[in-house]
């Protein structure tokens, strides 16, 4: 029996923060498929929030909620200030990135390399929790390099939990900090789901969320028999229509499953609004390219959006043109 939860701290399903993917346009698009799944920003560094363009980095549409802000950093006080800003901006959760293995992130001493510094992570969590009233959570790997035993994982979680963190999102792969690219670190290290299941058994008072290699609703349901929540990553971007049925199948809501055409119709007012605010059409439509993934003539959809959205004159009507091309491929002028 699938658990049903209400607030963001115990939401049973989420979409992972993904650089260059989970921006406000993708989140708005995904919200047309699922009203309840917890969505995340891309990772935003503390320095960027404190010294950058906050409107550009943090603004989102109310329809995107519930939405969590993922932070990157290693300074407890700076992260606390960013958490306060995120709460004031209207985010439902603050998440600390302890999972990204990229060289650029490591050079700033945050991301996955922080798994070797659980006391520092605990200090960061404690400072952020004191600064805000919304949940503060941690996303991390199952281990790093040769610190990848189950005992190492328990040691990390225990220290951070003692600082007050109650929700842990565990990517069920270790990360190699040297020798593998971030993309390779998402596929080469083997998945160890059993370790995450065992973590829930050993820490029943904590909310444990599993992440890694999850691509189907049936897998989500299977994992929910072992842990509190499931986070879906690349599959949400490569096959977003997967989420059209989760409100029914995971949250047991009675809302109708939208068709792909209905989703496009729902996007049109948003596209018009964002264009009025100066956004470019391809900033939005690039997230829609995989909507027809696996469907007949899907290539006509992708080709229309990819070939045309760079045109300065392109407007919302291009989505309708692409939809017609997907249905009737002969309508396009070469």
Curated annotation (Swiss-Prot):
* Gene3D superfamilies xrefs: 1.20.120.1460, Aldolase class I
Q: Required cofactors, per record? A: FMN
Q: Which Pfam families match?
A: Dus
- Among its keywords, does the record have Plastid? no
Q: Does the keyword Oxidoreductase apply?
A: yes
Sorted alphabetically, which SUPFAM superfamilies does this protein's record hold? FMN-linked oxidoreductases
| Active site (UniProt) | 100 (proton donor)
Instruction: State where FMN binds.
Output: 17-19, 70, 139, 171, 211-213, 233-234
Task: Explain the purpose of this protein.
Answer: Catalyzes the synthesis of 5,6-dihydrouridine (D), a modified base found in the D-loop of most tRNAs, via the reduction of the C5-C6 double bond in target uridines. Specifically modifies U20 and U20a in tRNAs.
Fetch the NCBIfam families from UniProt: PRK11815.1 (NF008774), yjbN (TIGR00742)
Output this protein's name: tRNA-dihydrouridine(20/20a) synthase
Which gene codes for it? dus2
